[in-house]
Regions:
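Positively charged, small/polar-rich N-terminal and surface patches that mediate targeting and assembly
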Residues: 417-424, 434-503
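Glycine- and aromatic-enriched membrane alpha-helices
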Residues: 2-456
């Protein structure tokens, strides 16, 4: 071998290793999604959120092995729309492309996990498991095959539709599934209040830890370098992808900070975290095909778009999305896909390129409207397909095993009602009745006689007495000392969170 052959072999091996490292980074993004969703929701549902994110990957892995991958990568497509599944993963073990399987698997899991946040705090765990199986088994693989089939058999591939890392295939599909699910499921108890004049007021139900949300955001941003960069085939392209994957979310976050500062009087922390993710989603389709100016504009629009969409869904359409998943993933998945038709430079590193390595340029780079038209056609087709399929899936679940928990289960929290978990933070916030640190059962107070207590001298009545006291957290110490002074030494303490009946 001469020096060039040795260099080519080393480069090929290096990128093969990087490909698997990238897949590992994408897998680690599951932790980021779990932290974002947990932080943006209430503490009483934290364990349920973690469990759903875990099952997304584990159930999805089995479904993707059984059918999903073979359906997506079929060599025998009918009109470029749906493939006849192959069974190479079972029958051709020694020659099977395991690297590609692992990479596509973690992408599939990402699409599935987006829905968790939008349907958080009121979805039956069993119903969510069925959904997770359905999207990984058949919903995602079909549309992903339109764009990413290895044999080039997908109908959008043949049109040279560009989605390098999944703004459309992953994020708009996951976001559309989240939107459909949130609509069919309905809002959380106490989220919306209807006034006498018929107007509907949106009540803020805050998450329990902005710190966890921020941690999740940084984990996702870190993982996104593998998400976007793993498929790069040369170092120049990889560096460009990394740069665009930095520019777009940074710009989106700064623009969102300024926008919310002007609009609301103060910069919104939670919205800025979502803006970072929105910028990442938006640049994903064109990360290998746009330049710095394109990345700046894509990120700037994403920073405003996420806030506007979240506000419209909440205040105007009254669709309850606890973490803003629809605004982040669907809206910016659509925007990022269309933006390729505007800002693609006509050169780069993309799996949808022509045989000579080139592809259509965008409208603002001398390519005319052809690529823009292809991008719009592709995103509309993908989203319509996702909306129809997910409506069928969620309606089937709703009318069979049921999609939503009971009001009582929702109020006490998914952790205890679905998993028997007293609290994800058992050492800090007990959510089950306790006396002197020990869990106690519920007391039937229906037949208890009212008791009176003299402040001067506490006298035992021989009866249980239940008194409910609601106080501000900063006054709890005074309440506890006062109760002790009159002889009350044991009490159950529960942190009230939420709105209306939740408090």
């Amino acid at each position: 071998m001469d020096a060039n052959e040795i260099l080519d072999a080393a480069t090929s091996s290096s990128f093969a290793i990087w490909f698997l490292i990238g897949a590992s980074l994408v897998f680690f993004m599951q932790a980021g999604f779990a932290m974002v969703e947990t932080g943006f929701t209430r503490a009483k549902n934290a364990g349920n959120i973690i469990m759903k994110n875990l099952m997304d990957f584990c159930i999805g892995t089995i479904m993707y092995i059984v059918l999903g991958f073979g359906l997506m990568m079929s060599e025998d497509y009918v009109m470029g729309i749906i493939g006849i599944p192959n069974l190479d993963i079972f029958t051709n073990y020694s020659n099977f492309n395991w690297s590609q399987f692992v990479f596509q698997l973690v992408f599939c899991a990402t699409a599935a996990t987006i829905v968790s946040g939008a349907m958080a705090e009121r979805t039956k765990f069993s119903a969510y498991c069925v959904y997770s199986a359905a999207i990984s088994l058949i919903v995602y693989p079909i549309e992903a095959g339109w764009v990413w089939n290895y044999g080039g058999n997908g109908w959008l591939q043949k049109l040279h539709f560009v989605d390098f890392a999944g703004s459309a295939v992953i994020h708009s599909v996951g976001g559309m599934a989240a939107l459909v699910g949130a609509i069919i499921l309905g809002a959380r108890i106490g989220k919306y209040t209807k006034k006498a004049d018929g107007t509907i007021i949106s009540n803020a139900i805050g998450g329990h830890s902005i710190t966890l949300g921020a941690l999740g955001c940084f984990i996702l941003w870190f993982g996104w370098y593998g998400f976007n960069g793993a498929a790069a085939t040369n170092t120049d392209s990889l560096a460009s992808i990394f740069m665009n994957t930095t520019i777009a979310p940074a710009t989106a976050t700064v623009v969102c900070m300024i926008f919310t500062w002007i609009k609301d009087g103060k910069p919104d922390v939670g919205m800025c975290l979502n803006a970072s993710l929105a910028g990442l989603v938006a640049i994903t389709a064109g990360c290998a095909s746009v330049d710095t100016i394109g990345a700046l504009v894509i990120g700037a629009v994403a920073g405003i778009l996420v806030d506007v969409v979240v506000e419209v869904l909440d205040k105007k359409l009254h669709i309850d999305d606890p973490v803003g998943a629809v605004g982040v993933h669907w809206a910016n998945g659509v925007w990022g896909t269309i933006a390729v038709g505007l800002f693609a430079t006509g050169k780069g590193d993309t799996v949808q390129a022509f045989a000579d390595g080139s592809y259509y340029a965008g409208l603002f780079y001398g390519g005319g409207a052809k690529l823009l038209g292809i991008q719009i056609l592709g995103i509309v087709a993908i989203d319509v397909y996702a909306a129809i399929m997910m409506t069928i899936v969620f309606q089937l679940i709703k009318h069979t095993i049921g999609l939503r928990t009971t009001a009582e289960e929702e109020i006490i929290g998914m952790d205890i009602s679905e998993h028997g978990l007293a609290s994800a933070y058992a050492d800090f916030l007990p959510t089950t009745p306790s006396y002197m640190g020990e869990s106690v059962g519920a007391v039937d107070v229906a037949n208890l006689e009212p008791a009176t207590l003299s402040i001067g001298e506490a006298k035992p009545t021989g009866k249980y007495t239940k008194i409910t006291v609601i106080c501000n957290e900063d006054k709890f110490g005074i309440l506890k000392d006062t109760m002790a002074a009159i002889g009350v030494t044991g009490m159950t303490v529960i942190q009230a969170m939420g709105c209306g009946v939740e408090q």
